[in-house]
């Protein structure tokens, strides 16, 4: 997206010059799905699809948000206003309001409002973490404008708090961490229990990652996402009768199998089994990445999707169609759904020489199966949220 064009759009909506332009990336997750809130490991990376913000300070306390993706969509509120926006047309402002609220709780000096023109090139409802991108965009803008002594990990935690407490979605920290801590051409191997992390180059050689958007938007807060969190929580509590653990991510597969009888509920056993096995797959996958064993990485990615389908039950027809069609194509190492599920997106690791045929073939299979088109994007891995 052209910076000069963004500046012109800001001036057209605010009748003044902008101060700065910022970009906050969306993210993919190579493997480690629904493990972050279970104290497990994840392996995400920020992508070139994301959210742009053109910023200008005001001399009053008004915050004026203008969305370039919905023509004329403007939300205004006072910087002291900490009320959750209930109106569906204004709900997107909550991601900004939550960050403003929690930063002002901890840091003095955020004493004036601002104008912000926002435009995203993320596919709508794609599950590529536009909400976390917005939260981290707001965090970095406020840190920059008011010279706040806040580190990026703390901003990621505030973004998670915005989701959990302000929005009401019981998500983990992976999305915010990936958006703000990203490093070009690398994925982040993150322990969500300790927040220890390691950058691993996404060295795929003759292969690339292709993002496949179902174009069936997911709405996590209105879906079964919170139910999955609760089911895992109940399973953990039952396991704690015999095991000294704080999270499902502390278990290996054998220990879980030995003590799963304590759960005594088939659905909760399935949910917990995914959380445990997916964490183990993530550990093995990152080791395969270090070893340069891309075929093993691909097999683990496929197994991740199967677990998300059978044990976690968050895939659905669209995501299953994309994954299963991908598995049948030449030059594909692995494919799986990413994000919360219930729509959204999938990824595939595809040989570069087969990429165009892959998109054509999978696209046709998908359209024939569901009745509308999927969208395909090459995943370019970029730095985390920053001024541009």
From Swiss-Prot:
Q: Which residues does the UniProt site feature Transition state stabilizer point to?
A: 27
Query: Which reactions is this enzyme annotated as catalysing?
Result: alpha-D-galactose + ATP = alpha-D-galactose 1-phosphate + ADP + H(+)
Q: Which residues bind ATP?
A: 67, 125-131
The active site lies at 175
The record's annotation in SUPFAM superfamilies points to:
GHMP Kinase, C-terminal domain, Ribosomal protein S5 domain 2-like
Asked if Cell cycle is a keyword of the record, the answer is no
Assigned EC number: 2.7.1.6
Q: Name one GO molecular function term.
A: galactokinase activity
Q: Where would you say this protein principally sits, based on its record?
A: cytoplasm
Q: Which UniProt keywords apply?
A: ATP-binding, Carbohydrate metabolism, Cytoplasm, Galactose metabolism, Kinase, Magnesium, Metal-binding, Nucleotide-binding, Transferase
Tell me the route in metabolism or biology where this protein functions: Carbohydrate metabolism; galactose metabolism
**Quick one: which residues bind substrate?**
33-36, 225
GO biological process terms on file: galactose metabolic process
Q: Does the keyword Cytoplasm apply?
A: yes
> Entry's Gene3D superfamilies?
3.30.230.10, GHMP kinase, C-terminal domain
One cellular component (GO) term of this entry: cytosol
Which locations, inside or outside the cell, does it occupy?
A: Cytoplasm
According to its UniProt record, what is one Pfam family this protein matches?
Answer: GalKase_gal_bdg
Enumerate the residues binding Mg(2+).
Answer: 131, 163
What's this chain's function? Catalyzes the transfer of the gamma-phosphate of ATP to D-galactose to form alpha-D-galactose-1-phosphate (Gal-1-P).
Family annotation (HAMAP family): Galactokinase (MF_00246)
Q: Give the UniProt family note.
A: Belongs to the GHMP kinase family. GalK subfamily.
What's this protein's name?
Galactokinase
Q: Which organism is it from?
A: Lactobacillus helveticus
- What are the leading ranks of the lineage? Bacteria, Bacillati, Bacillota, Bacilli, Lactobacillales
